[in-house]
Structures are given as structure tokens and as C-alpha cells.
A protein has these predicted regions:
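Transmembrane-helix motifs of polytopic, lipid-linked glycan transferases
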Residues: 78-94
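Membrane-embedded glycan-lipid processing machinery
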Residues: 71, 75, 114-126, 293-297, ...
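Membrane-interface alpha helices of multi-pass inner-membrane proteins
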Residues: 150-166
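Perimembrane helix-loop-helix junctions
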Residues: 171-195
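Membrane-embedded helix bundles of polyisoprenyl
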Residues: 101-116, 125-133, 154
Length: 344
């Protein structure tokens, strides 16, 4: 039949072999681990640029006092591994790519690997985990008449992450808008969301008040109100500009595919994909507004972008998409070489 012929043709293309192959994720893990070790050897003195540490006083103190310098790469690697696992679970639970795919995790690992400076431990790394958990509970609230509990947990993780990375609070506004689109925002669920977001801060307030360290409580709000150099993209490093350009091109193509081919997905899936498009666009805007936080926002940007890119490559099967897949892969390799070269 015609459908069977299309499947055979797709299986012969590189794109089909990679996206449908059972060894894609193990191969990506092996390649990423190897590149991670090689970049650690090539860049043994790699440190964060001044002003890019980000995070709250609590995060900076914990990072300095509790974690030796040699363990940064290992802890960061384990955090990214956890994010990759939860990306698989997120797709399996909500069927965003219409199949039990792990290609989004392979893409996420590769995107992180080609940016050696992201191998360091940023507040954004930990915030990315809470960000992903928050998305999970927000997705579960879709068209739920009793969504208070789901929004409570979703905003609880936003609040917990914002204690370490205050800029995560900005997403609470977008989350409320998306909850309204998911038809799960009522007065009761709004109160649940508000209680969830404030709960980590009540706990922080109790600790700060008891130990007379109120600066710990005030600092996240001060950091949130400090924007730094708005629109000053000149402070971005070459590797950050190159990575953002690469991600922007893939996002535009992936988002266009979601819009054009959205009729092939269920209504619920289209809502999830639109959410991911909104979040990715929001992250790009936030990076433009606060370029000093780029390194902390990139792990979050790669989460939403990797799902959209995976959706594009898994569900397209024509010659044009295969050529684009090959070009994107070659550009990813070149990006890795460029990023390493600029840091030598």
C-alpha cells in the first residue's frame, strides 16, 4: 500500500533511522559522556564568567560551602541526566510526540553537551528540574474541574525553584495564562496556586527569622527587581550567541510545523504544544531582557525546545525534513567545535 511504501522510504532515510532507532538514546549518552570528559580535559580551568553565577544568596552559599570545585561537573551531569529521564516520562504520560519516544532526551543531552560552559553548575540547572516538575502538574490540570491540587503543586515547584533562581517567578504569570487556556483556572484553583507559590517562602521566612538572617528572605525579591543591562546583548559571550541563534532557527521551524500540521494531533496535544511554543518564546524574550541570566535560562530553554524539535523530526518523513535534519546535525557538530574553540 501507499502507507507501507512511505514507511519503507522513511526507514531508509537518515532521519528515520535515527529518530526511530532503539540505539539512538544509548548512542547519544555515549557520545555526550565522551565529549563531556574530553571538554573537561581540554578546559580544566573553565570557570563561570564574573556576573554569570546568578541565583540567590542561599544558592551561592550552598554551592560554595557544600560542593567542592571538582564535583561541579559530576553534579551537573547527574542533574542533566535526571532532566533527560523526566523528559521521557513527560512524553510517555502526555503523548506529546504520539509515541513512546526518547528522541527529545537525546536532543536535550546533545544540546547541553555542545555548550561546555553549561557543564558547570548553575542555579538554572536546579531550577530546570523544578521547572519540569511544574510543567508536569500544569499539564495534569488540563480541563480538570477540580484542578486546585494540580495547580498547587505546579506553583509549589515554581516557588521552590525561585528561591534558588528568583527569575523563575516570572513564569508564574505565564502559568496562570496557560492554566486559563487549559480551562483549569478558577478562583479556587487560583488560591491553590497562590498558596503553593508562597509556601516555600513561608518556610524560608521561618528559617531566616529564627536565625536572624532576614537577608536570605529579602534577597530573592531584590534579585527579581534587578534587571541589569536590558537589551544589552553585547555582554553575551560568542558561544551563547551562537547557541541562541541555533536554537532560534530550530524553534522557528519546529513551531511552524506544529502550527501547520497541528490538525494531525489531538486537541489536548495541540494545547500542550502551544504551551511549549509560548514558553520557548517567553524564554527568548526573557534572555533578551536579561542577557546576564542567559547561562541560567539556557537549561530551561533547551527543555521546551528539545520537545518541539523531537516532535518535528519524529513526525516528519519527507525529503525536505531529511535534508534539514542532516543540516541541523552538521551545524550542531560545528557549533560544538566553535564553542570549544572560543573557550580555549
Amino acid at each position: 500500500s501507499r502507507y507501507r511504501i512511505r514507511l519503507i522510504m522513511k526507514s531508509k532515510r537518515l532521519q528515520g533511522l535515527v529518530t526511530a532507532g532503539r540505539w539512538t538514546l544509548p548512542a547519544a549518552i555515549f557520545i555526550c559522556t565522551l565529549c563531556w570528559v574530553l571538554t573537561s580535559a581540554l578546559l580544566p580551568e573553565l570557570t563561570m564568567t564574573a556576573g554569570e553565577e546568578g541565583g540567590s544568596v542561599l544558592w551561592q552559599s550552598a554551592r560554595t560551602l557544600l560542593l567542592p570545585a571538582w564535583a561541579e561537573h559530576l553534579v551537573s551531569f547527574l542533574i542533566y541526566a535526571a532532566i533527560g529521564y523526566f523528559l521521557i516520562e513527560l512524553n510517555n504520560r502526555f503523548s506529546i510526540i504520539r509515541m513512546r519516544a526518547s528522541v527529545q532526551t537525546a536532543i536535550y543531552f546533545l544540546l547541553v553537551t555542545v555548550c561546555p560552559e553549561m557543564h558547570l553548575l548553575y542555579a538554572g540547572n536546579v531550577a530546570a528540574i523544578t521547572f519540569l516538575f511544574s510543567i508536569y502538574f500544569l499539564f495534569k490540570s488540563y480541563q480538570q474541574s477540580q484542578a486546585s491540587g494540580y495547580l498547587f503543586y505546579s506553583f509549589l515547584f515554581i516557588g521552590a525553584g525561585s528561591i534558588l533562581f528568583p527569575q523563575l517567578t516570572f513564569f508564574s504569570v505565564l502559568w496562570l495564562f496557560e492554566a486559563h487556556r487549559f480551562q483549569s483556572l478558577t478562583f479556587r484553583s487560583f488560591c491553590g496556586a497562590l498558596i503553593g507559590w508562597t509556601m516555600p517562602y513561608w518556610m524560608l521566612f521561618g528559617h531566616a527569622f529564627f536565625y536572624d538572617q532576614m537577608e536570605l528572605f529579602y534577597h530573592p525579591f531584590k534579585e527579581l527587581a534587578t534587571f541589569g543591562d536590558i537589551f544589552n546583548l553585547q555582554i553575551l559571550q560568542p558561544w551563547e550567541l551562537a547557541t541562541l541563534g541555533y536554537l532560534l532557527v530550530l524553534f522557528i521551524v519546529s513551531a511552524a510545523h506544529c502550527v501547520v500540521a497541528g490538525f494531525e494531533d489531538k486537541i489536548r496535544t495541540r494545547a500542550y504544544l502551544q504551551f511549549l511554543i509560548d514558553v520557548t518564546l517567553f524564554l527568548f524574550v526573557l534572555i533578551v531582557l536579561q542577557p546576564s541570566q542567559c547561562s541560567n535560562l539556557l537549561p530551561l530553554l533547551m527543555i521546551s525546545n528539545s520537545i518541539l524539535i523531537g516532535h518535528l523530526f519524529v513526525l516528519t518523513n519527507n525529503k525536505t525534513s531529511n535534508i534539514f535534519f542532516i543540516v541541523a546535525t552538521v551545524c550542531l557538530i560545528l557549533l560544538f567545535g566553535f564553542n570549544v574553540w572560543t573557550l580555549l
